[in-house]
Amino acid sequence: CKGQSCSSCSTKEFCLSKGSRLMYDCCTGSCCGVKTAGVT
């Protein structure tokens, strides 16, 4: 996963359910690019 960005992965329903079009990081299994209040 070295040098891989979040945008390299497809969005996950889990991230979408947050209320924003967040990217899902396949490497860490977390959402990234989150700009929603209360979510970091």
From Swiss-Prot:
Omega-conotoxins act at presynaptic membranes, they bind and block voltage-gated calcium channels (Cav). This toxin inhibits rat Cav2.2/CACNA1B calcium channels in a dose-dependent manner (EC(50)=2.8 uM), whose effect is partially reversed after washing. In vivo, when injected into mice, it shows both an analgesic effect in acute thermal pain at 30 and 45 minutes post-injection and an anti-nociceptive effect in a formalin chronic pain test. Keywords: Calcium channel impairing toxin, Cleavage on pair of basic residues, Disulfide bond, Ion channel impairing toxin, Neurotoxin, Secreted, Toxin, Voltage-gated calcium channel impairing toxin. Expressed by the venom duct. It comes from the Eukaryota. This is Omega-conotoxin RsXXVIA. GO terms for cellular component: extracellular region. GO terms for molecular function: calcium channel regulator activity; toxin activity. It is found in: Secreted. The cysteine framework is XXVI (C-C-C-C-CC-CC).
